[in-house]
């Protein structure tokens, strides 16, 4: 199940060329019925999943366990540069041919990344999906990383990071992972400044050779025949076999990072280690997140109905924003609170929010509140898989994490199985756990961790 959090994903969009026409309509005008999701795991470990929905647009994604957590500490920023290198020259096509070819058929190539995975996705009219798939395979299996092309990406790398860091939340979340973990999940999503211009073609090749292996991949398609995907995977995605380099298990440590910059708004996040994705405890933390408040559910709403907002409103008369933070990974997780407040009121806002979580840990919650939180969580999950993009991402993420797919009805059953006591236990784990904190702004009135 995909958990909601403030951590985002990052994309680049490009385009490709014309392909043979495929017949998609049934003879005699017989209406076509959507098929069930098909799932296959090849002997080499590669997972294939597809759903033939007969939509006019097809979408294919190649998901790879190659997020920033797998970077060597000496080669940080490699996955960030890879996100920008999706249209560099390959053994089968020049950079111009890739870009011009996708444009010619009105297609789209996007590359997204999290700390766990990278996803290369092509989307276009189903009659042209074969040519888009050809470019997808070129980009992921046969990159050349010519030195002059890699060097030319330096300015894009700087701009990409600068644009992302205009949002204070990005810096807070990056610092939060840096201070919370000793390794793996501490690796940044964005290239460190000292590594700008120093990532070489050889480093990119090394990362691809050791992480873009068949056992670390999942090929997922919507609006595509399963037999076609299986044939493509067996023929073209078997170039690099094996498990690749094993990633280190994330080690939580806790700590504090404070950035004094004089901003009138103080952004602060306080978390403790929670649970890895895919187990009952992680579901309890997800329910707790929505119990406390995961953000407004009404456009331009002020989220006044959440427990956190109600608690903070009693302790501060100044404008603020507060929500629960929840991020789950394959071997760890973070849960806590995220606040935005006026500098003078930062202490009041943070303490009021923290005390509300303590109140839940002491059992001050009603079954009606827990049920409402479950309903919000279920609605959020169902809406996230309503679009083809969200559905594709969910299938790919599950395929990489577990090698299988859990349908929405099963996910909803697991959410319903969370008891009130499980939510209280999750809150207690946060309150008693070792904390990590990051804050930025004018921090004169922002408490330190030991002052909470």
Curated annotation (Swiss-Prot):
Pfam families: Peptidase_M16, Peptidase_M16_C
Annotated signal sequence range: none
Listed name of the protein: Cytochrome b-c1 complex subunit 2, mitochondrial
Reported tissue expression: Expressed in the head region and flagellum of epididymal sperm.
Chief place of localization: mitochondrion
Gene Ontology biological process terms in this record: proteolysis; response to xenobiotic stimulus
Location in or out of the cell: Mitochondrion inner membrane
Transit peptide, start-end: 1-14
Keyword DNA damage: no
MF annotations from Gene Ontology: metal ion binding; metalloendopeptidase activity; protein-containing complex binding
Residue positions where N6-acetyllysine is found in the record: 65, 198, 249
Membrane topology of this protein: Peripheral membrane protein
